[in-house]
């Protein structure tokens, strides 16, 4: 079994078993199942793991913020709203992570105003990337705190230039003072505003607000 060590495990709140080996994680999961339904099942099988349990997550989210005068993108530290800048997450799809890195660079170059949850002011709140594992289609969702998105046409054009593999780009508008990532309104900026993927022979349409 291949093992890698996450450099963010002591600060990031996304992975609760990041300090254990993958083998230990599988054992712990089996023990959890046994503790819940063991009295009903005599023979609980071992958990089936992956040979390479990394870069498998095809829904990748990052929140934007500022560290001093620098724009950062990452995830919240556990139990806080302190953003931990993430450059290379070991469980996120590598292609999605690269797109988020590019979006962060473009935010800086286009001087997009980052949303401040304390003051309720600013434009860009989050970025979400979804990837169809069978179709390889990619959706980028830019979550803004208002309908206005300065330089959006040039922003989208440059993002597509750097990542021609992107299928669709959507602006999601979340004007609420809430910890919820997505709002209810979606505005396609490029493409159809959704992607499709195939699972068990069935084709599904995936929107920004899908599971």
Named regions from a protein language model:
Residues 1-211:
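Accessory RNA-recognition modules of RNA-modification enzymes
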């Amino acid at each position: 079994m291949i093992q890698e060590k996450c450099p963010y495990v002591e600060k990031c709140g996304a992975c609760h078993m990041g300090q254990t080996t993958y083998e230990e994680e599988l054992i712990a999961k089996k023990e959890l199942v046994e503790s819940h339904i063991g009295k009903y099942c005599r023979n609980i099988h071992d958990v089936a793991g992956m040979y390479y349990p990394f870069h498998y997550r095809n829904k990748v989210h990052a929140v934007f913020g500022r560290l001093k005068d620098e724009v950062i993108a990452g995830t919240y530290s556990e139990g806080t709203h302190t953003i931990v800048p993430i450059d290379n997450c070991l469980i996120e799809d590598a292609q999605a992570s690269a797109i988020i890195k590019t979006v962060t660079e473009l935010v800086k170059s286009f001087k997009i105003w980052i949303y401040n949850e304390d003051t309720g002011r600013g434009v860009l709140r989050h970025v979400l990337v979804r990837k169809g594992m069978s179709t390889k289609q990619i959706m980028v969702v830019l979550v803004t705190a208002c309908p206005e998105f300065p330089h959006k046409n040039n922003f989208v054009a440059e993002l597509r230039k750097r990542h021609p593999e992107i299928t669709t780009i959507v602006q999601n508008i979340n004007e609420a003072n809430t910890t919820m990532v997505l709002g209810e309104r979606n505005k396609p900026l490029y493409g159809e505003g959704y992607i499709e993927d195939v699972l068990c022979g069935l084709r599904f349409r995936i929107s920004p607000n899908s599971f």
